[in-house]
Amino acid sequence: EDCVACGMGKYSSVVGSPSSTTCQDCGAGKYLDSTGNDEETDCIDCGAGKYSDTVGAMVAATCVDCAAGTYLNTVGHALKADCILCDAGKYSSSEGATSENTCQNCPAGKYLETTGHDEVGDCVACVAGKYSSVSGSSSGTTCLDCVAGTYSNATGATSSETCEKCCEGKYSHTPGAVSFDACQDCSRGKYSGALGATSADTCQDCVAG
C-alpha cells in the first residue's frame, strides 16, 4: 500500500508505522500548514505578539493577537496570560504588539496607577489645584499642589505656570487651592501690593491722610 502522509498540524518520526496513531499533534503555541512532516521542529511557532491554546493547529490564523494594553516579545506561546501587561503609567491601543516600546507614556498632567490599559483616556488627570510635568507617571503623588498664594481650577495641568497668583490686596495660606475664593482680603485699613501673598503679614497699615 502507498504510504499515507500525516495530516496538517501533525508529525511523526516513526519509520514504517502501520497506523496514523503515530502522527502526533503539534503543541499549543504552534501550527503546521503542510502534510508529511517527520519532526516536532517542523511545527511553526506562533509569532511574537500572538498566542494559541489549540493543539494540532493547521493554520497560522489559529494564532490570536495579544489584546491592546499588552505585548509579547517572544514566540511560541500557548496562553493569553503569557501576554505581558503594559506597566502602570502606560497604555497601548495596538493589538498583537511585539515590544514594550508599544506601551506609551501617559502625558504630563496625568497618571495611571494600574497596568494593562489600552487607551490614553484611561490616564487620570491631576485634579484642580495640582499639576505634574512628569509623563508616564504611575502615581497621583506626582501631582503637586499649587503653592500657597496661588490657585488653579484647571484639571490635567502640566506646569506651575497654570497656578494663578492671588491679586494685590489678597493672600492665601492654602496650598492646592482650586478657586480665587481661596484668596482672602486684607483686613479693613490694610493693603498689600504683593501678588501671590501667602500671609496676612504682607498686609500693611494704610497711611493716614
Model-based region annotation:
Residues 1-209:
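Disulfide-rich, cysteine-dense extracellular ectodomains and adjacent flexible linkers of secreted
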